[in-house]
C-alpha cells in the first residue's frame, strides 16, 4: 500500500498504436470477466489484513530524466471503512497535500516456471474513485523478448463505490482486453505496447534493483521506453493468495503475441465456451504468410492451455477502419491439421471479396492485393467431433488424401464376408442338392457385446448371388441386411461387385483378386424444385429513393438532398444544417401506413446510400437486413404509428443489384422519357454549401466528366442555354434528385413488365439479378428431381475445390499487330452445349472405372502435366504473391471435373484417380439458353429486350455455386446488444453513431431457409468453359500474348471457322493493336491500328478507376518497372455514417505470380514460362534469368532490375 505521485508526461518514440475494438465487443469482454462486488471487498479486506500482520516492506525508487516522476512513500496501513457495502479506505491517514494523488494498490507477484517474477498492479485513486493504473511485466528468457504494458485510468468507480464488473484479474486477460477496458471509460487515453529485444539482457541480470537506473542511462533506448510508470519490486516479495478462491495468476510465456493470464477455477468452467485469440501484429498484406504466422501462434497457445483434440476456429480480419470480417466460416480442426486450416483460409482469402462495405472500397483492390489489418481467432474446444453442428461444414481438404479403409473386410459386428464369388471358399456354407440355394449360420455381437445367431439364406443365380441375413427375436424373424454379389459380364468369381443393403442404405464394393478396388455409397439429397408462375406483378409496390451528397473540407461525403417517389407523389428534402436530424425528419414522412408494403429501390444502396440511411432508420423501428458478402441487399423496417398498435413495414432494395449498370446507361437502354440529367456536383463541395446561390451556371470544371459518363464542353454549352443568369441552386438540385427517382421508377416498371410478360415472374419478390434469373429458370425450364440441392454438407466444400475461374495469364509482355478475340457468350455456350451433373451423387473410394465404364462427375486425381508452353489444367499453389490459381507443368493433386481431365489427355496429360463423386448426365440448360438467345437475336441492340436477354444469359450459372453458409444480420439497441453479446458465440459488430449496433452472426444454413444451391453445376460450367478456351490456347500457343477468361490476344488471325460476330461459342474479332504491352494479368493497353469506338488507344487496369494513358503503362514495362499513381478511393464507414474520399497511391509494376518471368541480356522481360510443380510444390525459379549468348552479366543486371 503506497501513496504514489505520478507526474504527467507524454509518450515519446511511439512504436505503434494499439487498434481498439468496438464498443459492442468491449461489452462482450466485460460480461465474460465479471466478478461480484462483495467477493472483491472480502478479498481486499483479507489482503490488507494479511499485509498488516506480516508488516510487508517494499523497496522504492524514483524516476527522472524526462521519463516521468515516480515517488513511492511508505504509509501506515489504513483500516478499511465499509459504507453501504461500498469499500473506501479511510482518507485521514494520508497527507492532505497528496490527497489528489493517493492510490491504493493491490499487487500480486507470481514466479514463473523460468524463475522470473511477474507483477500485476491494480490501483484505486482515493479521490477520483477510479482504478488508476494496471501494469504487467512479462519476461520470456527462451525467446529473449521483453514486454511492458501500461494502462492508465482504467475503470470508473460508480456511486462513490467500486464498480468491479471489469476490475479483478480475469480468467484469461491480454493486452487487447486491458486496452478495451481502458478506452471504455477513457476514449482519449493512449495505450502502448513496447517490444524491445535490446533490453532483454537487463532482465537476465540477477540484480533487478538497478533496472530503472540502467534504463535511464541508455540513451539509445530512452526514446522508446514507456514514460508513464514502471513498477519495480523486490526479488523476495512473496506471492499473494487472495480470498477463499486462492486466485493465482498463471504466467504464460509468449513471444510476439498478447500476454494472457487465466485462473485455474474459471478455466474449467468455460472450457467448452468460446475463447478469443487476438494477434498483436498489424499487416499491410494479410495473405497466406500472415495466416501461417498467426495460426502457428494460435495452435501453440491452444496446445499450452487445452487438451481437447478437436476445436472449431473462426478467423477474422480487423480492418484499419475498426470493422471486422470473417474469413470463410467455422472450421473444425485438430493440432495435427494446421496446414489444412491454413490452406482452407487461404482459399477464402483468394476467392472471397474480403474488401467490402465493412472495410475498403473495391476500387483499391487488384489481383495481387490482400486486405490490411490484424487477425483474431474465436475458437471453441469440442467434446467430440461426432454430433456437433460444425462437423457438417468443415473443410477437410488435403492434398495428400488417402483412402484409409478401402481394403478392409465387410465387417458387421464380427461378420466377415469373403472377397470372392467362389463359393468353395465360403466357410459354413451349406448348399442344397441342386446348388441353387444355400444357408449360412454365423454368430455376431451387438453393440453391448452380446452374441447372437444369424442365418443367411443364399439364392444362387447365373453370375449373381443374393444372401439375406435374418435373426430370430421373440418368435419373429427380423431382416438385418442383404448382400448381392454379381460378376456382370466378366464370369470371373474374383472380379465382382457386392451390394450391401442395410436399413434402406446401400454400399457397393468392387473386388478384384481378393482386394477392394472401389467402394461406392449413395449421397442422398433433396432436389431443387420448380416454383409456380406469378399471375401478376406488383407494380404498385415499386417506389424509388435517391440521395445526393457533397464533400466537406475533410473529404467526407455528407447528404444534402433526398427525394423519394412512392408511385404517386414526389417528396424532396434539402439538408442545410444538421443532416442527420433533417434526414430523420424526412424519413418520418415516409413511414406512413399508406406506404406499407412498398419497396423503395435505391440505385447503389449496397455500396453507397446504405452507409447514410442505416443508422437513421434504426432510430425509427426494427431493422431486418439481408446482406451477402457484406453488401446490404435489402433493409426492411417494421414500425408503428403513434396511437396505433398495428405494425407496418417498408423495404429498401438495391436496384443496381438487379440492373448492374449506371442510371445514365439504363435510361438509354430502356429508352425512357425521364432520362438522367446533369448537375455541377463539384459546386457543392467545400466548407459551406451554396444553397442560396442564384446566378450564372457554375463553370464547366464543376461538372463530372468520366469515361463512364461523358459530359463534353458542347454538352455544357447546351446546358447553359436553358438559363439566363437565373440558375437556382436549390431548384436545380431538387430537380436533379427528383429526375433520378422518376427515371429509376420508369426503368424498374418497364423491366418488371417485360420480365413478367415473357416469363411470368414478379421481380419485386427478389433482391438481385441472379435471384431473378434463378426464379425464371425454376419457373419455366427446371426439370423435376434432377438437380441435387447440396447445401450445408461436406460435399459442397469438397466439390468447391473443383470450382475455379477461367484462364487469366500473360505469356508475352509486348508485341505489334496484336489481334483481340472474345468468345460470344462463353458461359452460356458451355451451358447450352454440355451435359451437367444431375441426379443422386455416388461417392466412390478408389478408381471409378472399376465401377462403371463411363464415369461422369468429379474426381480427386494426381495429375501429371506435359511440358506445354500453355498448360490447361489449373491448381492452387502457394506463390510469392499468396495462394494463386495457376496452370503449371509437373505433378499435382486436386479435385476436377473428369471430362476436363479427359479433354487434357489428348494433349499429353495423365492422371490417377483415388476418389470420385459420380452423377447422371443431363443437358438442363439448352432450352433456357436457346430461348434467351432467340430473344436477343430478335431485337436490335438499342431495344430493352436485347439488353435484358443479354443480362439473363450471363447471370444464372454462378447462382448454383452460392455458399450455403449464410449470415444473419440485425440492428439492436445498446441494451439489447449487451444481452445479445452475453449469449452469442460468433459475433462481429459495428457500433453506429446512435449507439445502436449492427450484428453479424455466422449461422448454418439449416437455421434459416433452403438456399437451393448445387456447386457441381457451377463447377461444371466453369470447367466446360475452360475446355472451350483450351482449344485456342493449345492451337495458338506460339502466338499467344494474354488470355482473360473468354478472350485471347494473339499476333495472328485465327482460323475463320472459329470466327463469327454472333454465333454462340465462336470467337468475335474485336480490334487490332498496332502495338501493345501486357504488364500483368488484367493489366494491359495498346494503340489501335484504326479508331475503335471513337478511341485511338485503350488501357485496362484492374482495380484502377481513374483512366491512365497508354504511354504511362508502357513506361511501367519499358523503363522503371514500377510506377505510382494517385487515385481516389471511397472508404465507407458505417460506424460514422459517412464515406471518406481518400487519395491513395496505386503501384503499377510488371508482375507475375502465376508464371515464370523470362529476361534477356538487358534485364528486360521478354516472355514467361509455366511454373513447374513436383507434388504440389514449386520447383522452378519464380524469376528465370536467361540470355541467348550465355552472357554472364545478364544475370547480375536482371537480378538488380528485379
Swiss-Prot record:
- In terms of superkingdom, the source organism counts as Eukaryota
Catalytic reactions of this protein: DNA(n) + a 2'-deoxyribonucleoside 5'-triphosphate = DNA(n+1) + diphosphate
Q: Name the EC number(s).
A: 2.7.7.7
What is the disulfide pattern of this chain?
none
Localisation: Mitochondrion
Identify the GO cellular component terms for this protein: mitochondrion
Q: What class of enzyme is it?
A: transferase
In the record, the note on similarity to other proteins reads: Belongs to the DNA polymerase type-B family.
- Give the protein name, as stated in the record: Probable DNA polymerase
Main localization, broad class? mitochondrion
Q: PROSITE patterns given for it?
A: DNA_POLYMERASE_B
Q: Which Pfam families match?
A: DNA_pol_B_2
